[in-house]
């Protein structure tokens, strides 16, 4: 069965377009309620319950109400967490023994986008097959439950406080953050009232950024996708380092005291090297976009490295397949399965800091053996219906580039899971060669797509 509505991270789009409307989201909630609840064996008279969390977008209120109506029509109780990070929904769903969790967020996208993604009772993303089953039911008629079986809604008391304590518990008890000055950029997003509390309660002096959401400013020149704001604040405040989350708090990048940026690949390496030194690791999962330098540095640690498809759900699937506990993406999604069931920006940052304290080192020294290959990524818009995979000009351009790079580089062409774009990535030892080849392939795609 093909995927009609779900992309790589749930259902996502522009608010008011075909899928991000109150009507569609109500139908989606109903379909998810019927699908997920049908798999649960509950005691007689007990209704299933699903948690809903959201980020700070103004459209979240509208979509939350629509989801609530859909679940209630399916006979499902709803527990409302309010604005909390995506990983908080995963944690609370599991901790409260609920049947599923739902996040209303478009992650790092601007405020006028939004989306819906689901978590299982175990706090993991739903498998493709289950999402496809929900899609099928979305297009079927809604049959409202009898009045006596309709679901009810209530708010969770101190959902944010419970998650703060969970994050703190992921940091070693023998350490604290006293003496550290940390700039924390919460992207005016879901972690705005949570992130500062976590690091402050662990002892750090916290300089907060992006903690004044107004419904329209999420990810606007702040957060993990705009690290220049974090860098400027770190340098201006002479901080030890800075941490930037994205709008829903599931990804992280960091900046050291000198203003150097550390993306997901670098942070993943810091955690891997520390855990390997303790004999706690067998392998690391990256993605097709992970830098070759990371793969080879992980190999020098004596660890295996596997590449998953892009998307934290696929990283997690590969981790489970291989029985490994650590994986991540260069975008900043890092999954530490000994700490959480999903990617968590705050928890991942704490694992990096713990590694630095254990190794008595800085981010720069922790990454001294990690040499990145120059990488060029170009996003090329695609015309509707264009089949780039069967175009001979594009195939020839890719083959020529791969032949020229040999074993010292690679070429990756990957369609976006959320936008009509083809991502052209070239990587190799020679930066000018990489730039030239990437631009040539991108030009071929543009001309072929016209």
Swiss-Prot record:
Catalytic activities: alpha-D-glucosamine 1-phosphate = D-glucosamine 6-phosphate
Cofactor: how and how many bound: Binds 1 Mg(2+) ion per subunit.
Binding positions (Mg(2+)): 107, 246, 248, 250
Active site as annotated: 107
Recorded GO MF terms: magnesium ion binding; phosphoglucosamine mutase activity; phosphomannomutase activity
InterPro entries (alphabetical): A-D-PHexomutase_a/b/a-I, A-D-PHexomutase_a/b/a-I/II/III, A-D-PHexomutase_a/b/a-II, A-D-PHexomutase_a/b/a-III, A-D-PHexomutase_C, A-D-PHexomutase_C_sf, A-D-PHexomutase_CS, Alpha-D-phosphohexomutase_SF
Keywords for this protein: Isomerase, Magnesium, Metal-binding, Phosphoprotein
PROSITE patterns (UniProt xref): PGM_PMM
The enzyme's E.C. designation: 5.4.2.10
Listed GO CC annotations: cytosol
Cofactor: Mg(2+)
Signal peptide: none
Post-translational modification: Activated by phosphorylation.
Family membership noted in the UniProt record: Belongs to the phosphohexose mutase family.
UniProt function note: Catalyzes the conversion of glucosamine-6-phosphate to glucosamine-1-phosphate.
HAMAP family in the cross-refs: GlmM_B (MF_01554_B)
Annotated protein name in UniProt: Phosphoglucosamine mutase
Source organism (scientific name): Aromatoleum aromaticum (strain DSM 19018 / LMG 30748 / EbN1)
Name of the encoding gene: glmM
